[in-house]
């Protein structure tokens, strides 16, 4: 019983298929990988179903898909500015991937993939590497103007450059921790309050208080649904802002 009530137990990785060991490291296909494959499959299926007809007068599914895409396209354009259209597919894919994974975590007994820092960090690393690679491809060494804001006095440039470099390097950390921490904390709180209900029901007369944690669990669940959507949007928005540096370094 103690294991079931452990709020951290839900984040434990469980190997589904083992591929042996490399040194002391166990290599396995876990439920985390399964949920990520499922998310990609669901997104691909919905996209194919929604766009299979490509009618001039769109149906409900096509209208919904277009609304989602146009919403992200608008976000990218507002955050990254001119020339950002080429990054809309990337940001849209990241948004949908994070959104579906977050919503998976709201299903009872499902696994919350985005509660693992390694997953969110790799997603953030994709963003930063895209910024760096495209920045150098499009602007060459002038991409480094990103670290030298215009109008800075010469004597102050070494300090400003150092601060800008540290800030840039910390971006994947802050981007990944923001998503990871929000999903982790919310699911821990939900598990704790949900665990109070059977505990109070088994405590005799104290069972009359069980509706209180039940109501809190419902409220936290609703809040977590909102957080799941908002965190996907925040991830997409920050990605767009970071991509603007690749498009317009030094501005």
UniProtKB/Swiss-Prot annotation:
InterPro entries: ATP_synth_F0_asu, ATP_synth_F0_asu_AS, ATP_synth_F0_asu_bact/mt, F0_ATP_A_sf. F-type ATPases have 2 components, CF(1) - the catalytic core - and CF(0) - the membrane proton channel. CF(1) has five subunits: alpha(3), beta(3), gamma(1), delta(1), epsilon(1). CF(0) has three main subunits: a(1), b(2) and c(9-12). The alpha and beta chains form an alternating ring which encloses part of the gamma chain. CF(1) is attached to CF(0) by a central stalk formed by the gamma and epsilon chains, while a peripheral stalk is formed by the delta and b chains. It holds the Pfam family ATP-synt_A. One of its GO terms (molecular function) is proton-transporting ATP synthase activity, rotational mechanism. The chain crosses the membrane at residues 29-49, 56-73, 87-107, 117-137, 159-181, 192-212, 218-238. This is ATP synthase subunit a. The keyword Zinc-finger does not apply. The keyword NAD does not apply. It is a multi-pass membrane protein. The gene is atpB.
